[in-house]
């Protein structure tokens, strides 16, 4: 399947329904039980209690579930895949591993499976994929072939206290102080103004009421965790930069990457990030997405500017916890949110790839993604995200960020192919280095320029060691 297919016909309306149901699964010749690796939480509980029993009843194939934390999934599955003993039939992957696993031959292209097992062949899979966001399919593809079906979209949005932004007194004070209206930040400079403005000490007024505790402008995922890279990446992309640039030939085949020797946009992002930190909720080196969501939920901050929209339900608790609080969502400052998804794929050494294929399709149906949405997840299908009932105020607690996610995903449809972040088969090796460098650059005693010059050298080394195409220096203009 060509990657270009994943960029056609994009509008703000969903495509024609291309629905698959359990009833369409044909009789299976292979009844060997299969094993699914899935993340702990409500989604796996729903699969185990609702969907998998129906699948077994329909097909006669038993499904074993290995439920594990996301943090341990990569190592758990990679070790099994290296052994080639068919331990797992269906894998759960993070988008950053997708191309690496595909390049290693760990996962099977979906069209290859469709040709083998689907009565309608490739056309059935192409039709099945129509409702999915092209951005996510492009991220999960390798050599123009899709290997996985996404289910958990973690595209970013800016979660903010709408009640504070719309307060007349706060609006007047902000206008007087900064000379422009108080609205969700469209760039990191405006975000810095808002961070300063909303940071208050206990006893000061916030929306005409005295604070009983210190209040902060924003929450940053500034701990020594992977997520600080996602914030930095979003800022860098908004400045027109990248960690590495994919270069294509006239046939649109990837030939190599260019890595900036002195990454000016990364340096600017580091400076901007440091300016934000004094106005962020106090964070230790373990502070990440759960802590940031909690800071919003407990009324400690005005903005979580680089929030994962699949945590909207966590941020939204502020409306129950703080009288009068209302949560809003906008695009991230700069308009280039980090994006990706967790996805399911069939392993190369599956003992029953026929059943694994059909279960994969069943777990990605409208029914399944709708249930995922009702549980608080951020779905990957346009027809679910844009379902009319999710626009009702009664569904705001779970679906309040759906429209923002929809716009962000459409923005990234084919643009993800313009960034090395989403096109390198070595990103599983490179990503941890990005995270380490971003955390180091956030520390005030560190030399940002030196850190990112060293990082560029490391990126080249890792790409040239583990990647399929080389990386060379990109000379500064």
Label the predicted regions:
Residues 141, 286, 399-460:
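C-terminal capping/gating helix-and-loop segments adjacent to ligand/active sites or protein-protein/ligand interfaces
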Residues 190-199, 234-286, 326-328:
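Glycine-centered hinge/linker elements that transmit conformational signals in sensory
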Residues 19-28, 95-157, 208-211, 324-331, ...:
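Hinge/lid segment of periplasmic solute-binding proteins
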Residues 34, 53-132, 168, 294-295, ...:
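Extracytoplasmic "Venus flytrap"/periplasmic binding protein-like
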Residues 21-24, 41-62, 159:
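Short, polar/charged alpha-helical segment
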């Amino acid at each position: 399947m060509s990657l270009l297919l994943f960029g056609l016909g994009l509008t703000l309306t969903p495509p024609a329904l291309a629905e698959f149901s359990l009833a369409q699964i044909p009789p299976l010749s292979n009844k060997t039980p299969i094993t699914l690796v899935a993340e702990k939480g409500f989604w796996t509980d729903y699969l185990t209690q609702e969907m998998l029993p129906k699948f077994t009843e329909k097909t006669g194939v038993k499904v074993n579930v290995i439920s594990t934390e996301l943090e341990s999934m990569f190592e758990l599955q990679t070790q099994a895949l290296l052994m080639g003993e068919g331990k797992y039939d269906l894998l759960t992957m993070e988008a950053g591993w997708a191309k690496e696993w595909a390049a290693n031959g760990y996962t099977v292209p979906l069209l290859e499976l469709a040709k083998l097992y689907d009565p309608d062949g490739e056309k059935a899979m192409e039709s099945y994929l129509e409702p999915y966001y092209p951005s996510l399919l492009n991220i999960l593809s390798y050599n123009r072939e899709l290997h996985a079906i996404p289910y958990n979209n973690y595209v970013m949005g800016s979660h903010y206290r709408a009640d504070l932004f719309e307060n007349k007194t706060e609006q007047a004070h902000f206008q007087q102080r900064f000379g422009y209206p108080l609205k969700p930040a469209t760039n990191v400079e405006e975000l810095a103004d808002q961070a300063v403005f909303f940071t208050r000490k206990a006893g000061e007024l916030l929306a005409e009421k005295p604070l009983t505790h210190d209040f902060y402008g924003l929450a940053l995922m500034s701990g020594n965790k992977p997520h600080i890279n996602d914030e930095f990446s979003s800022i860098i992309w908004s400045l027109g930069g990248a960690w590495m640039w994919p270069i294509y030939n006239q046939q649109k085949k990837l030939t190599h990457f260019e890595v900036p020797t002195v990454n000016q946009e990364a340096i600017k992002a580091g400076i901007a990030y440091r300016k934000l930190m004094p106005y962020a909720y106090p964070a230790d080196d373990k502070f990440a997405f759960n802590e940031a969501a909690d800071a919003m939920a407990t009324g400690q901050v005005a903005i979580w500017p680089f929030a994962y929209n699949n945590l909207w339900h966590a941020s939204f608790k502020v409306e129950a916890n703080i009288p009068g609080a209302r949560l809003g969502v906008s695009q991230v400052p700069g308009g280039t949110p980090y994006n990706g998804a967790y996805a399911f794929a069939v392993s190369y050494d599956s003992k029953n790839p026929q059943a694994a294929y059909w279960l994969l399709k069943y777990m990605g149906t409208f029914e399944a993604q709708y249930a995922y949405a009702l549980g608080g997840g951020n779905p990957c299908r346009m027809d679910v995200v844009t379902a009319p009932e999710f626009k009702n105020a009664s569904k705001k607690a779970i679906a309040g960020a759906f429209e923002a996610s929809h716009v962000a995903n459409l923005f990234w449809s084919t643009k993800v192919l313009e960034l090395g972040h989403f096109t390198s088969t070595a990103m599983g090796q490179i990503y941890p280095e990005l995270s380490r460098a971003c955390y180091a650059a956030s520390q005030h005693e560190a030399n940002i320029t030196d850190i990112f010059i060293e990082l560029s050298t490391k990126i080249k080394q890792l790409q040239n060691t583990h990647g399929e195409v080389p990386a060379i220096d990109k000379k500064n203009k």
